[in-house]
Swiss-Prot record:
It catalyses: apo-[ACP] + CoA = holo-[ACP] + adenosine 3',5'-bisphosphate + H(+). Belongs to the P-Pant transferase superfamily. AcpS family. One of its GO terms (biological process) is fatty acid biosynthetic process. Its main location: cytoplasm. It is found in: Cytoplasm. This is Holo-[acyl-carrier-protein] synthase. It comes from Nocardia farcinica (strain IFM 10152).
Amino acid sequence: MTILGIGLDLVTISEFAEQLERTGTTMLRESFTAGERRYCQSKGTDPARSYAARWAAKEAVLKAWASSRFARRPQIGDNPYPLIEVVNDAWGRPSIKLHGLAAEFLPRVRVHLSLTHDGDTAAAMVVLEDPGELADLIEGREATP
């Protein structure tokens, strides 16, 4: 088991809410999956808190992925945000589901996620863990049997 990368991101909820409310913005549609939009809208009068936490999670995943590829291009694409989805289990615990290029570039990686809100701040912490031989593949080494 190897830690491949760590990512942390903070979002100011009020500033994020302003961005979402701008006339003509396509951020929700272009950055969040339909499932994420349904979840956030179900959170009552302040969906921006949930959107901000999910945005922080997406950014934290990208930072963790980039740190795992130090001095090399991350290669996830021009708009990776809808490829990184925050999902919740039956008890509300969040986790990351990767799609498309993100899933291809991070095969077999375990993504640990923690989200929090406090006052006007949402935060996410992500740890990418290789449960086996992936670190060797990323570094270009021959995987050991």
